[in-house]
A protein has these predicted regions:
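Bacterial N-terminal signal peptides that target proteins for export
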Residues: 2-12
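A beta-rich soluble binding module of mature secreted/lumenal proteins
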Residues: 22-176
Length: 176
């Protein structure tokens, strides 16, 4: 996503993310095993923890495709500004599966401006149509789906996030 931050602001933001991840004392969440096909195609972001980077973003998505090596994933994250018909904002990153060949559930993504996020897959639905990921400290959580979910399905997703130990009152559900 294209942001208007000066160089010092970007550096400060990157340092805060790194320090926040390193300094947090937390119980490491359990991950599940996912196949390599998990990192193919487009997932819709139907729920997320609010953060500065996604302010004003609706109709969010993440598109994955294979990188140069088996453990590398090329990522495009995007959203529309303010309404689903709004201006498209995108950012590209390069992901590395940190536990390649075992669970394939821990991915570190490097974005521009030295911003790095860790995404761990905590749950994937039996029909593989949606999943929940979080950072290792469980301070940020995302719910993704291949399609816009019904209200009932969204409630199941939220309940699952709660079962995993996340305070779902912190989640926001942007317009699709």
């Amino acid at each position: 996503m294209k942001y208007c931050l000066n160089r010092a602001g970007r550096l400060l933001l990157a340092v805060l993310f790194i320090l926040g991840e390193a300094a947090a004392a937390y119980a490491t969440p359990n991950v599940i095993k996912v196949g390599r096909d998990h990192y193919r195609g487009t997932w819709l972001e139907v729920g997320r923890t609010p953060m500065f980077l996604t302010d004003g973003c609706v109709a969010g998505y993440s598109s994955y495709r294979q990188g140069k090596s088996p453990d590398e994933i090329l990522i495009e994250d995007g959203c529309s500004v303010d309404t689903p018909q709004g201006r498209l904002k995108t950012v590209r990153g390069t992901g590395t599966i940190q536990d390649f060949g075992t669970t394939n559930a821990k991915m570190q993504v490097r974005y521009p401006w030295l911003i790095t996020f860790n995404y761990w897959v905590l749950y994937k639905s039996p029909d593989k149509s949606w999943f929940i990921s979080a950072n290792p400290s469980m301070t940020n959580l995302w719910i993704y789906s291949r399609n816009v979910p019904s209200k009932n399905k969204l409630h199941r997703m939220i309940n699952k996030a709660s079962e995993l130990g996340y305070d779902v009152r912190k989640l926001e559900f942007p317009q699709q």
